[in-house]
Amino acid sequence: MPAFPKRSKVDAGERAYAYAKACGIIGKSFVGKRISALGKLNALNEFGRLVFPEAAYELPGRELLVELERRLLQRTIRHILAVIDSYSNPPELLVRQLRSCEYADLKTCLRHIAADKPIPATLCDIGKYGTVRFKAYPDLKAMIGGTEFEFILSKDLKAANFDINSLEAEIDLQYYTLLMKSLQRLPAEDRLFAQRILAEEISLRNCVWALRLRTYFEKTSEETEKYLMNLEIPECPPAEIPGDINSRFSSQRDADSGRISLAQEAFESLYFPLDARSAWKGWRWESLLNPEEGREAWTANPRFFQNAASRYIYRLSMRCFRRLPFSVNAEFCYIKLKHFEEDLLTSVAEGLGLGMGGNDVFNLLEVPA
């Protein structure tokens, strides 16, 4: 591990407190060995008692599911804020991670505005870190005027031929661009593992988009290219993460800038047939594709790939969480773990609401019980 300069006492104290908070919360979260408890559930009220033992739930099925999803979102935000607020001046990277839910909610609101639907039932509240004024819905100018989202005001959401997917891709690009910039402003120690994990996430997100657009929307390879986030990063530092899938090849590095394209794998995937798995052999993310099943015809499954990608980022975050305990890397991984947990808990709750068992949901998501 490379040597890094010592930190001031005040900074070290805040970092130690934030890390202790994160460790305490992770110990009670449904990650690692505690995930298995979710596979034993068979009803929504059991789920409610396990995750929120302090509350009583007497609501009917559908209403109970909505209430639990609302509480899960609040729980995740509360747990992330508990760590971020340990800092007198929180690192911008962590605040931008927190604000991912604001970006997601804004995209949902834009779809609702375009379709003349009422305000979504559940929206995040991240307190002083929020910038979108959701209470002004559906007045878009009042919602986002003066924020980093003001560029959206030039779009005609209700035009007959308006491409909402293209706008969402633009919003995603802005989120990850600003996230990467905040990462690069940190000292080397604080971005050692965070940069690796974020680079993998962006690459995989591009690949998921490419698969979804080609499969569900029947976009051509040329049409799909414009939706991808063609972001670049400096060559990742030589930090080994157990379970990392194939180090990046030198061919991905721009000869002039020495930087790595995070759209490279997605661009490569655009020219692989969706019905011949053998053609994907040698592709960096090949192991995350759905396997061939006997003599059945194979077709690329975007949902399978997305679930596998999510588990991969989770495993990297889990392995890196404690490797540099008093650096921003730890809190970065912590927030990744909390987001994974929220997605998993929401999926289990939705499955139970449909009459599935927890183990059935695990099988659907390819999560080991």
Regions from the language model: what does each represent?
Residues 1-369:
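N-terminal domain-start signal
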